[in-house]
């Protein structure tokens, strides 16, 4: 804004700020001229107030001046903080007659006192909610013309800088030129201060661009091109910072005041692509300002989208590297598993071979052990039977044979002593004929001649063989002397019977021979 002395002592308000409102909001307009509100103040008084308290003096004078200025003016509405090309969170205007946000007296409670009237006949200010976000501490400089010193006030946490409007004084015609650092406080941030602000890693809708609620409706006087050709932006990767420091956007302080307007190539290209005229002079008209806001918003959205794509690409690259490392580890683990499987197979083969060898050896030993066990059992049983046989001769298998032998000897002695009986027996057998063999009589009288009984009794008679032979020789001589007139068959039978006791095989052969001879 400018306040110029043009011959008559009155103040003139710049129209750059007043044209920010919409045309259809005439119900909340202020028809009172800004100069009418300041009629009671002269140029000298206003100059004294500007050079006195707001930045150099104490807080009390500034409060008094503010009360005097705001006592006669109605309460204006607040302006929303974020517009198309604003990056500031504070919606209060920049004015030398109001408190700065960094001063102790300016806070959310004093927001009603930070008011400023505007010169407007048929236009008003759009009522929008206030975002109570205070600015960081500021560094303020006052630069008067001539040889006046330059007082500088540094706050404790100076992160942003604002240049105080320059005051030019002449002896004859004093001219006061008030040039805020930016068009309104919507554009008040310097590149140095913005370096401290880091752009959050969020989608493009939250990086310094206007929200949908704060966008002004598009007037038909600014037609858009039916074929939009979006410009391809190539921005080198950079550290997260505010979009206002981008070389694709014009600095906000260059959009204020009057004079030639220098836009960036990207802004010019976007304006031409959208079908808007390229502004070259300041101040901007309402249509030019709306078009500039629109294309600046689009450029910021493009920049934020590129930043988002860059971050996404970095994230995807990191994930790809991680996947590659994981795949390499997986391949190594697969190789190890294959080696372990091969080792396991070889060990299983060795185990099966060892089991086969052990299975081949175990049955042989078991067979040997079984044979030895059966042999031992048979030997034990035999010894036990012999032991019992020696103690109990009546239970031995040869006891019946012995008894039969004794009865045979008794019968033989009886037959030889009583020759008449034997003759009668022989005479009884004679009618049957001597031609037929008579084995039944032999078996009945001498049951001990059976082959099995003789075999079992042979080993019992070995010790008594000599005694029996002597007795047999005596018995043989007796029948020869007593019965000399007996038949040849009877003698042969008796001889064969006595010789059978000495030799078992000879008995059977001689018995058959005698039977054949009789036949």
UniProtKB/Swiss-Prot annotation:
Region of interest (Disordered), ranges: 58-77, 85-121, 193-261
Residues spanned by motif S1P recognition: 423-426
Residue ranges, annotated region (Basic motif): 293-322
Regions of this protein lying in the Cytoplasmic compartment: 1-374
Membrane topology type: Single-pass type II membrane protein
Bias kind Acidic residues: ranges: 109-119
Compartment list: Endoplasmic reticulum membrane
Post-translational modification: Upon ER stress, translocated to the Golgi apparatus, where it is processed by regulated intramembrane proteolysis (RIP) to release the cytosol-facing N-terminal transcription factor domain. The cleavage is performed sequentially by site-1 and site-2 proteases (S1P/mbtps1 and S2P/mbtps2).
Coiled-coil boundaries: none
Glycosylation sites: 485, 503, 516
Bias kind Low complexity: ranges: 205-217, 240-249
Region (Leucine-zipper): 333-354
Any one Gene Ontology BP term: chondrocyte differentiation
Complex formation: Binds DNA as a dimer.
Known role: Transcription factor involved in unfolded protein response (UPR). In the absence of endoplasmic reticulum (ER) stress, inserted into ER membranes, with N-terminal DNA-binding and transcription activation domains oriented toward the cytosolic face of the membrane. In response to ER stress, transported to the Golgi, where it is cleaved in a site-specific manner by resident proteases S1P/mbtps1 and S2P/mbtps2. The released N-terminal cytosolic domain is translocated to the nucleus to effect transcription of specific target genes. Plays a critical role in chondrogenesis.
Protein name: Cyclic AMP-responsive element-binding protein 3-like protein 2
Taxonomic lineage of the native organism: Eukaryota, Metazoa, Chordata, Craniata, Vertebrata
